[in-house]
Amino acid sequence: MRITVLRLGHRPERDKRITTHVGLVARAFGADEILIEGRDESVVESLRDVVNRWGGSFSVTDGIAWRDELRRFRDSGGKIVHLTMYGRRIDEVIGEIRSCERIMVVVGAEKVPPDVYDIADWNVAVGNQPHSEVAALAVFLDRLFMGEELEKDFGGRLKVIPAARGKVVLDRGL
């Protein structure tokens, strides 16, 4: 399964930290790439630096035209999941979604245009209450992969060695 996260409505002056966290969660929880509407070199550099140090093949692209990207993805056979508190409950649809080969997960920053609700194959709610898009993405990906993404070895230069106390980081010097 290939997962692309599309970050809609990124505003560089307001959303730098949250968009970075969306990217970090996407990478750590099993997505293959993030596409960011709008340009923000600092977010791109930050995420690429994490990939360089901690491993994986996660890619980051900013400045995308989201409507074109959604249409292109859908026309090529991919399925679109829009995370929104107004959608169907995650537990009702996650089984169907798991059967897809390519998924684009749409995560909004500001008010999401109605077109997104219409083009999405699934509008999915991780709870029907307001909360963070970072939390919604983490829960969605964890449910999608049934926790298996947490066992992945990213093959990076740095690797955390789980410890009951303190911080243990292995530097493999790659």
Curated annotation (Swiss-Prot):
Its main location: cytoplasm. Its EC number is 2.1.1.206. S-adenosyl-L-methionine binds at residues 83, 108-112, 126-133. The keyword Methyltransferase applies. It is found in: Cytoplasm. It is an enzyme of class 2 (transferase). GO terms for cellular component: cytoplasm. The keyword tRNA processing applies. It comes from the Archaea. GO terms for molecular function: tRNA (cytidine(56)-2'-O)-methyltransferase activity. Pfam families: Trm56. Keywords: Cytoplasm, Methyltransferase, S-adenosyl-L-methionine, Transferase, tRNA processing. It catalyses: cytidine(56) in tRNA + S-adenosyl-L-methionine = 2'-O-methylcytidine(56) in tRNA + S-adenosyl-L-homocysteine + H(+). GO terms for biological process: tRNA nucleoside ribose methylation. Specifically catalyzes the AdoMet-dependent 2'-O-ribose methylation of cytidine at position 56 in tRNAs. HAMAP family: tRNA_methyltr_aTrm56. Homodimer. Belongs to the aTrm56 family. This is tRNA (cytidine(56)-2'-O)-methyltransferase.
